[in-house]
UniProtKB/Swiss-Prot annotation:
Residues 1-36, 125-209 are annotated as: Disordered. The gene is gar1. Keywords: Nucleus, Repeat, Ribonucleoprotein, Ribosome biogenesis, RNA-binding, rRNA processing. This is H/ACA ribonucleoprotein complex subunit gar1. It comes from the Eukaryota. It is found in: Nucleus, Nucleolus. Residues 144-203 are annotated as: RGG-box 2. It comes from Neosartorya fischeri (strain ATCC 1020 / DSM 3700 / CBS 544.65 / FGSC A1164 / JCM 1740 / NRRL 181 / WB 181) (Aspergillus fischerianus). It holds the Pfam family Gar1. One of its GO terms (molecular function) is box H/ACA snoRNA binding.
Length: 209
């Protein structure tokens, strides 16, 4: 559906090209095409060229995968999605043209298309609703210790051990959508929850016989 550092300048609107789309993998090269999909859907319209790439405005309610192949209406491949930019309610994306395709050969308003299997629903990048007040998260319970055998009969063993494990850590706040370009205002930075939870609860101490 990584994080790139410095921005690449040159957008007509002055947007930063460092569009950090939460959880994005590294920029992959062009892979061998297995052929166009049986059906292509309109993804967006060409706006202008920038540094050899095509800047497009999305007209699709869904979000394209990074590196998703992009086609003309006749299913001729022209390149792959390189960046997703803009606020969550107005998405832009860039296309890295494949060999033989020149970004400046397109005119503003030219339509580009994508396979339906290369789209993600917008809801996937929105924060999940908070649980209702008063609800408590389920806690994992550690197993009890066993009984040790052997040795002469004596008094009771050591008192029960304390609970193990560090206190539960909380992750960072959930993100919203996409970072990067400042087209029409700031977007939301995507991403999954931050740091994981703490270690599981330790078992109780055993009794010696």
């Amino acid at each position: 559906m990584s994080f790139r550092g410095g921005g690449r300048g040159g957008f007509a609107s002055g947007a930063n090209r460092g569009g950090n789309f939460g959880g994005r993998g590294g920029r992959g090269g062009f892979q061998a095409q297995t052929g166009p999909p049986a059906q292509v859907l309109e993804m967006g319209t060409f706006m202008h060229a920038c540094e050899g790439e095509m800047v497009c405005e999305s007209v699709n309610p869904k979000i394209p995968y990074f590196n998703a192949p992009i086609y003309l209406e006749n299913k001729t491949p022209i390149g792959k999605v390189d960046e997703v930019l803009g606020p969550i309610n107005q998405v832009y994306f860039t296309i890295k043209p494949q060999e033989g395709i020149v970004a400046t050969s397109f005119k503003p308003g030219d339509k580009v298309y994508i396979g339906g299997d290369k789209l993600l629903p917008l809801e996937k990048f929105l924060p999940k609703p908070k649980p209702p007040p008063g609800s408590k998260p389920k806690k994992a319970v550690g197993g009890r210790g066993g009984f040790a055998r052997g040795g002469a009969r004596g008094g009771r063993g050591a008192p029960r051990g304390g609970r193990g494990g560090a206190p539960r850590g909380r992750g960072g706040p959930r993100g919203g959508g996409f970072g990067g370009g400042s087209f029409g205002g700031g977007g939301f930075r995507g991403g999954s929850r931050g740091g994981g939870r703490g270690g599981p609860r330790g078992g109780s101490g055993g009794f010696r016989r």
